Swiss-Prot record:
It comes from the Eukaryota. It comes from Gallus gallus (Chicken). Pathway: Nucleotide-sugar biosynthesis; UDP-alpha-D-glucuronate biosynthesis; UDP-alpha-D-glucuronate from UDP-alpha-D-glucose: step 1/1. InterPro entries: 6-PGluconate_DH-like_C_sf, NAD(P)-bd_dom_sf, UDP-Glc/GDP-Man, UDP-Glc/GDP-Man_DH_C, UDP-Glc/GDP-Man_DH_C_sf, UDP-Glc/GDP-Man_DH_dimer, UDP-Glc/GDP-Man_DH_N, UDPglc_DH_euk. NAD(+) binds at residues 11-16, 36, 41, 89-93, 130-132, 165, 276-279, 346. Its EC number is 1.1.1.22. The active site is at residues 161, 220, 276. Homohexamer. Transmembrane segments: none annotated. This is UDP-glucose 6-dehydrogenase. GO terms for molecular function: NAD binding; UDP-glucose 6-dehydrogenase activity.
Amino acid sequence: MFEIKKICCIGAGYVGGPTCSVIAQMCPKIQVTVVDVNEARINAWNSDTLPIYEPGLKEVVESCRGRNLFFSTSIDDAIREADLVFISVNTPTKTYGMGKGRAADLKYIEACARRIVQNSNGYKIVTEKSTVPVRAAESIRRIFDANTKPNLDLQVLSNPEFLAEGTAIKDLKNPDRVLIGGDDSPEGQKAVRALCAVYEHWVPKEKILTTNTWSSELSKLAANAFLAQRISSINSISALCEATGADVEEVARAIGTDQRIGNKFLKASVGFGGSCFQKDVLNLVYLCEALNLPEVARYWQQVIDMNDYQRRRFASRIIDSLFNTVTDKKIAILGFAFKKDTGDTRESSSIYISKYLMDEGAKLHIYDPKVPKEQIILDLSHPGVSEDNQVSRLVTISQDPYEACDGAHALVICTEWDMFKELDYERIHKKMLKPAFIFDGRRVLDDLHNELQVIGFQIETIGKKVSAKRIPFASSCEIPKFSLQDPPVKKPRV
């Protein structure tokens, strides 16, 4: 059996970095080199301040960096020396041309394929780690075949990641499953067995699933679509709960005890974010449309539509509760990452909520324990989010949550950081304007509602009526749909 002794991973991001760090730690006899064109990112991986925040990641990197784990910008050299090359580059949603706003942009995948074939000789296994459309491996293989040379044998596998940001190290060390897809040919199965042997250093054989390449690629899209679907499903029920007086947490607990349903991903919130869910569902929608399956496409599009609706509904609820206007009102935004235990802000609901409130003239004071000020400003300065000097006029980045809440009309929790449960809310209430509102978009304060009401807060939370004093405005503001993938629309100057 072919033995993998050297691994190269192209892409030092949220997938490539943690994945290869764990492989290096679990396989001390395998040399793992993570490469990237971004020199600053590689320098960060080689420093004490890693470019991404992930619980446990720093300890893993420090245990094997310089021994059998290396980070480099010497991409061609790493490819030439490797027995196996992981492709772990970004596959963003297209923002132009055919499939704009839905199809995956594979330009980085194509660039990797061309670079690999240019710098390879002999036998090498090339493995998709990035989330890709079905039959992307066939496109890679066509590039290899068109640029073949004597004695070159490149085998293409699919090995999608299923880690979740915030629990990536735990997920990598104890995965629910490892999925490897390859050709049914003898050469393809030889490559599959070689990659299986790498994972068998720490993953039980029964958890390593092998399929054909296309099933593996589709399984990744389907898995993310199913998870996003569950979130949108419970969020749809949260709207019904708010209208009827039911509590979505109680409903989720009741249905989650049914073993056929289960209790995971039934946490109502302001909406899902991150780099994968929306991108992969939209990719699935586009795939269905391209294959003339419009009914299937419409079914999955509704998952995205419901997520957009939940964000708009939450922002509208904030505006309604604050006497139907937030113009020039200070509002504290607590949390900017798309979920706790990560510094990733991609498709974060905080961006959308901030955009809707800025459009109404609110003055936002934003705090997040792990997202740098520069990243927040960059996200909110996106041409589709804000206009001209809107961010400089309306956004302040706070150093701590108390500073953000000082003098605020309301505080809005957009990320479920554990620290927000431990804040001194009596201190916060004294410094806020009255009535003081809390809008809990992640239901992190459920156990504190009685205490907070005694202090004097007006509480609005997802999927539950809490404050009886809320004034419903008949002319509730209608917030238009918005996507980070939309081209910016310039409003005419008056």
